[in-house]
Amino acid sequence: MWLDRRGWLRVLGHWRYDLRRPSFTRTWSGDKGPMAETVSTQVGTEGGLRASHQQNGDAGGDAKVELSPGPPKPAGREVEPAPVGGEHPSAAAPGPGKHKKRRGATRERVVPPPKKRRTGVSFGDEHFAETSYYFEGGLRKVRPYYFDFRTYCKGRWVGHSLLHVFSTEFRAQPLAYYEAAVRAGRLQLNEKPVQDLNIVLKDNDFLRNTVHRHEPPVTAEPIRLLAENEDVVVVDKPSSIPVHPCGRFRHNTVIFILGKEHQLKELHPLHRLDRLTSGVLMFAKTAAVSERIHEQVRDRQLEKEYVCRVEGEFPTEEVTCKEPILVVSYKVGVCRVDPRGKPCETVFQRLSYNGQSSVVRCRPLTGRTHQIRVHLQFLGHPILNDPIYNSVAWGPSRGRGGYIPKTNEELLRDLVAEHQAKQSLDVLDLCEGDLSPGLTDSTAPSSELGKDDLEELAAAAQKMEEVAEAAPQELDTIALASEKAVETDVMNQETDPLCAECRLVRQDPLPQDLVMFLHALRYKGPGFEYFSPMPAWAQDDWQKD
């Protein structure tokens, strides 16, 4: 090192030390011109070296300026320079005697990062073993079982308490139930028991709610295998059985029945049939086969053919309906013809007429939700026993010609009220706990709560209300009993002291409630074609209208 003419003490490595101002300055050549950096050796009020300054060559317009800190500032709060160019000032450094807050230092609740979710098929032996079936009165029934509902905190829940979320979005149970569930250890937040329902939720919070689950019965009719090879499994789906878990259904679904009774696992549904629709249903055995056939669907290489029985005398000539279809509510699963809807096309041909109803062959050329049912309603010939689109809730004309003298909110209110009175909310893929505001969402599923005029839909069936009224007086005692039950292997019990459903007596559905006269008859694609037998109600001599 040596002194130069300007009083700089030169140091190897392009560093210079200013004897007049205790600081180091380093210069070097950059891509955009000369670069310089100054580091002060003075100890600031924080007890450390002053921050360095850096200039970026000619691009910044100040390459020739060498910055060095001025004289020490008096102790006290430093005045920050005004932001340049509208930029927000950066956070100030801690003052004298202050330390930067460390995470969790103020007992603030720390949320662990979300776990990586499993991809692909999610049902295996551990899921199939949760419970078992039994058969009674022509029905397949599921023994009640314990089940963990798991979810990450939704955006609309952030900043709200658990108490608020349960009281506004999970109304299947009274708040007294959730308080008892906390005492019984049924509610967990980030894998730790919830101690207080007033805890405020944060982003990435992981919720686990252990419930005693009851599933609705379905037909005892077996699922018949139509074909099986190394690529696909094709079955004849009975009416009333959902394809995959949804709503209150889990084990009483085609996916679970095939896994439990036929050891057919890791199946990929290639298309969907409504719960009350019967007929040809295809599954791929691998993701590669699934992608190949879905590509054929997108390229319109597949042909689907259905048969149905409709009201009245359908025209003898072929009828093509191209009316667009709009989803009124994703939650309820209701659609209607509307100019704002997506383009659809269905071709109809009458097969027979028995004087009261007609058997009609249907060829959907597009694949919209409830397409056949909605188009038949528009044509004035709804499916004979369609519980949604042949309902008086649509008005006197039952939606013929697209005439519906109600708003979407009024339509949904009347549909839900009708099926609630019949205790048949499963037809709408609903249970009592789903009856909260926000049933109308015609553009997409909404994350916001719905309108106040749907508040009346939050009421459960009368029997459920009676149980809820009695619950607060009983749940304190029940919670203690539940804690002891857990200790004695409650997971094997079919009754649960906290479960309101266990104290209800529900009537079994009638056989006619488990069938809709819509059947998937044929499914054809490149290199394959599968048929299902014509159902009894589609025969020419059928006379049970």
Swiss-Prot record:
Keywords: Isomerase, mRNA processing, Phosphoprotein. InterPro entries: PsdUridine_synth_cat_dom_sf, PsdUridine_synth_RluA-like_CS, PsdUridine_synth_RluC/D, PsdUridine_synth_RsuA/RluA, RluA_PseudoU_synthase. The modification Phosphoserine is found at residue 68. Residues 48-121 are annotated as: Disordered. One of its GO terms (molecular function) is pseudouridine synthase activity. Pseudouridine synthase that catalyzes pseudouridylation of mRNAs. Disulfide bonds: none annotated. The modification Phosphothreonine is found at residue 477. This is Pseudouridylate synthase RPUSD2. It catalyses: a uridine in mRNA = a pseudouridine in mRNA. Its EC number is 5.4.99.-. One of its GO terms (biological process) is enzyme-directed rRNA pseudouridine synthesis. The active site is at 274. Pfam families: PseudoU_synth_2. Belongs to the pseudouridine synthase RluA family.
